[in-house]
Amino acid sequence: YTGTIDKNGTLNGDIVIEGGIDPTLDSKHFPDRETFVSAAVENIKLWGIKAIKGNIRPEEKIQPHNAVPKDWLDADVTEDYGAGVHSINYNDNLFSLIIDTSSGRALVVDTVPHLRSIQIDNRMTVVNRGRFSPVVQRKKNNSRITLSGAMRRMQEPIEVVTTMPHPAVGLCADVRETLESEGIPVEGKKVSASDSDAMQILSYESPVLPEILKSLLFRSDNMYAESVQRKLGESIYGDPQREYGEKAVTKIVEQWGINMDNVTLYDGSGLSRTNRMTPLFLASVLRSAALDWQTGDLFPTLLPRCGVDGTVRNLLKGTCLSGNIALKSGSMTGVRCYAGYSPAERPRYSVVLLTNNFHCTYEQLKSSIERLMVGMFESYQDTIDKRQNTP
C-alpha cells in the first residue's frame, strides 16, 4: 500500500497490485489454490486497515495495447484461446456479459467481473424461436465490444463469456467489491502518496513452473504459453514485451546449436500465422530438450500421453501406442500438428508430424495419422513389450 494508516485504521493511500505475468491468478485450472482476492482481502484486514481513502489500482509492465500480438486475427481475440497476456492475468482473462432478454430486447445488465471501462455497442436482436447465436467482436488491444446476432427470449438472464481487454481492471473491481462486502469502504479519492515508500502487504506466489507447464501442455493453453514466453524474455533481458520473449527463445535454441534457417518465431503459442518452422527444427528442439541436463529429466514427463491425457486423449486410443507415446497437439483451420516423444516414459525418438491445407475431414485425417504412427512404431513397441515380459 501507499500512504499511511492512521490510528482509526484508515489508509490514506492506495492498495497497489503489481503483476508478475502469472497466468494462473484465480484460474479455474488451479481450483485448489486460495484465490488471490481472498488472500489480498485477508491480509489487508490483518494490517488493521478498516477503510481506504484512495483506490485499488494495478501496476503493470505490459500495457493493454501490447497484450495481443499484432498479427493475431481479430476474429480470434474474443475467443478463450485468443486471450491476450498482461502483467496481471486474472480469471483466465475471461469475463461474462449478463444479458436480459425477458422484455423482448437484449439488454446487457451486468458484467462479471465489473468492467466500468468497457464500451459495448449492442446490436443484438431477440427472437422467440431459432438458434441462439450471439456474436462478440472486438479489435485487438481495444476495449470496445460489438454484440450482434440473435438471442432467444428467456425469463432468466443469459451469460456470454468472452475475453477481458484489461484483466487488471476486473481484478481491482473484485478486490474492491470483496473489501466493501467485508465492511471496508473504498472511497476512490486521489491521494498524494508516493509509490517509492509503499509497504508490501502480500506476496502471492504462482504454482511451480512444472505445474504451469503441464497444465499448458495438457490443455494447449495459448495464454499460458504467451505468459511463459514473456516471462522468459523478462528473466533473460529484463523486458516482458513479446520481442524479448522471442529473442530469449532464439538464444536458447541457438545455444543448443540448432539451425534456424527458414524458421520464424513470432509468438509463444503458435496462434500467429507468421510462425514458420520445419519438422526437422521441432524434432531438433525436442531432442535437445530431452538431452539437456537442466530439462531432460522433466520436460518429456510434462507432455500428455496419447489415448490417455489432455488434447490427445482420443488419438491412438485402443492401439498399441495408447499411453506409450507423448505428444503436444496444435491446430487451427487447415492445420493439424503433433510433436513429442516415443516411448513416453523413456524417450528414444522425437516425433513430429505437421499437416497443412488438408481437404479431408478431421476424422479422416486422424485415422490416417494413427495408421502412419502405428505402422512406424508398432514393431518397436512389440520389441519393448517382449523385453519387459522376458523372465
Could you describe each region identified by the protein language model?
Residues 125-298:
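A small/polar active-site loop signature that marks catalytic segments
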Residues 118-139, 162, 199-205, 314-345:
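Short, Gly/Ser/Thr-enriched beta-strand-loop segments that form substrate-interacting elements
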Residues 57-116, 121, 275-320:
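A conserved catalytic-loop motif detector
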Residues 226-391:
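Small-residue-rich helix-loop
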Residues 1-85, 90-92, 97-98, 142-155, ...:
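Active-site-adjacent loops and short helices of periplasmic peptidoglycan-processing enzymes
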Residues 3-7, 99-101, 138, 341-345:
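Short, low-complexity Ser/Thr-rich regulatory SLiMs
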